Amino acid sequence: MSLSIPDAFSFFKLSCGSWVSQRSSHHLLHRRAEPGASLIVVKELSATDDRLLSVAKLHQKNPNMLVGGCWVRWSGSMAWDQEGESHEGESIFGLIPTDENGREGLLLRDRGYAETAPVAGKFQMDEHDALLLSTSYDTMISNERFWFTGPDIRLRTSVVEGLSNTASFCIETRREYKAILNDNLNTNNDLMHSKFGW
């Protein structure tokens, strides 16, 4: 089962909310899998939001081409983390379609995931209404596929090639907004001590 989603911005709007993501990352060099988990918060931004306008300016793109975007914050951990190692951050995403249907185009970010420098990637919706993201960094290339099996379950696969060669699979489950207090990321003790590394 999958959802019918007309365009990429609709996909991002459907992704708004808070999510618990359970991940298995396969390190191809070591031939080992590493479990992990994260809490992700996504909020929609209008095309006129000052933060989106700043991202467009950062990438030297016409802000009038923006259809909207989102603010994303994440906090997580992986099983092999060293003491003091952190997987926390936030980013602004801006969408600029390059076709009249809004199903492909540019995804502007004020910071990346694999590398923290500002980055512009490409998005595309496939024939199954899944969202494909391709991002080229200085030292690696990331390809991701996101799709919904229902309004509250999102799946993700990702492959990173370069200095770090990994393949990952994530199951992301929606949580209610009331689980997020004062827009800060809070986790309960059960989640923090789960086998996924919290």
UniProtKB/Swiss-Prot annotation:
Keywords: Lyase, Organellar chromatophore, Plastid. It is an enzyme of class 4 (lyase). It is found in: Plastid, Organellar chromatophore. Gene3D superfamilies: 2.40.128.20. InterPro entries: Calycin, CpcS/CpeS. It holds the Pfam family CpeS. Its EC number is 4.-.-.-. One of its GO terms (molecular function) is lyase activity. GO terms for cellular component: organellar chromatophore; plastid. It comes from the Eukaryota. Belongs to the CpcS/CpeS biliprotein lyase family. Covalently attaches a chromophore to Cys residue(s) of phycobiliproteins. This is Chromophore lyase CpcS/CpeS 2. It comes from Paulinella chromatophora. The lineage of its organism: Eukaryota, Sar, Rhizaria, Cercozoa, Imbricatea. The gene is cpcS2.
